[in-house]
Amino acid sequence: TYRDKKNDKILRDMFDYVIVSTGHFSVPFIPEYPGMKAFPGRIMHSHDFRDAEEFRGKNVVVLGSSYSAEDVALQCHKYGAKSVTIGYRHNPMGFKWPDGMKEVFYLDRLEGNKAIFRDGHVQETDAVILCTGYLHHFPFLSEDLKLKTGNRLYPPKLYKGVIWQNNHKLIYLGMQ
């Protein structure tokens, strides 16, 4: 069932299968940390990261431990960031980082221009870049048809990563 806005009509069509192929890289996941609202520097999501030149000469904190975090952190370093501190939540990426880069355990809070990590590390920072993934967002589906899962490489209840186990005629592509 859908609305034809041009003709202001409600229409209903029947299909054997429905494929949801909208992907999930449009609504960034923005975690909340104490002190974020009062942080005097820049906070952005990797979704909006365009040019590492902006961070030349600055202390940058990158939060995340997957491909985007690695890419953003290395770009910031390459383009002259004063320091790059990567905060991970579960496991460090574990690379031998160049001088001026390090990994530390989980951001606890921001206090002024300082990032305080759970392992006790304190880092002055000018910018925080969130490489924290994306939310699944399906505003066009009714609640009973929406895939409800956190940001995961292999969402549960998707057989072979595509066929929804709650309704085998609903196929999700690009959710990983």
Kindly give the residue locations of the regions a language model identified.
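Flavin (primarily FAD) cofactor-binding/catalytic cores of flavoenzymes
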Residues: 1-176
